[in-house]
Amino acid sequence: VVETIGLPNRDLFIFCDDTDYCLRAHIAGFSLYYIPAALMDKHKFFSSDTWTTRNQKKKWKRYYQLRNETYMSHHYGQNWGVRHLRGFVMLLGYWIPALLSMPFTNAWTMSDLPVLWRAYRDGIEEKLGKR
């Protein structure tokens, strides 16, 4: 696989690098196998945190998640809706709860909203890499 499609895309920092690699392998004609019994041992980063604390801790990851998922939809999408709207719906999925919770918690601030917009735009424009 590596000789045919190369290594995973390191510019998809944290999110979607595995999905992109599988899509590229599939497009190149390789078979993919789903192993439902496979396990991943993740560190319990949020185990005893409140909702507000969890949101604050993962704020920096949201940019990459939104950007990379928007990139995947834009890059591999087969129609305009997938290429442009899927990422925008995800953006709204962050904006709306943020706006609704701001008066009651400090998990979100107004300065978070432009960062999320930039993540969406960077995904559409296929600007990847660590930021």
Whereabouts are the PLM-identified features?
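Active-site donor/metal-binding and catalytic loop motifs
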Residues: 35-54
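A short acidic, glycine-rich active-site loop
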Residues: 53-63
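A bilobed periplasmic-binding-protein/Venus flytrap-type ligand-binding module shared by bacterial periplasmic
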Residues: 72-74
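Non-catalytic, C-terminal membrane-associated alpha-helical segments of glycosyltransferases
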Residues: 78-131
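Active-site Gly/Thr loop motif
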Residues: 66
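A short, conserved alpha-helix in the catalytic core of glycosyltransferases
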Residues: 1-7, 11-39
